[in-house]
Amino acid sequence: VAQFAVDTEEEGIALIRGLLSYMPQNNMEPAPKTICTDDIARKEDVLNEIIPDNPNKPYDMYEVIRGIVDNGEYLESAASYAKNIITCFARFNGQSVGIIANQPNFMAGVLDINASRKAARFVRFCDAFNIPIVTLVDVPGFLPGTGQEYGGVITHGAKLLFAYCEATVPKVTV
């Protein structure tokens, strides 16, 4: 599974530059911090209204992410794989972070085998490069069904939990 896909060489070079801006020079250095150009007094009124009163109605987690990160900018990893979970790099006050978020707009944000694998891999990657992890949780649970059970949803879910437990970087869950 490719983490990124682009159409042109120019897009590829820009994507690589963007990705490298979130990462340290090596795994022994801390995650990079840049000068924050976002308005410290910025208010995102959309965040007060984005989650519907009806808990069965979905909302777009991308709007939440855009509303909370510096300048609304982030770089998503594996965007076309396991769309029920979002993995991306962003910044808070200039500090590079990895964000993992359930996407209620796709399969209600449930955890299935692929989402668990995607998130676990991202947690391990962030931990390997000292990138703090922010998790935005709105999950109804694991996807039920014989296909998931025979495929090992419990095993893959446990691997996700184990990746979080093993990670030594700062972790915040909202």
Stretch-by-stretch model annotation:
Residues 1-174:
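Ligand-binding clefts of soluble mixed alpha/beta catalytic domains
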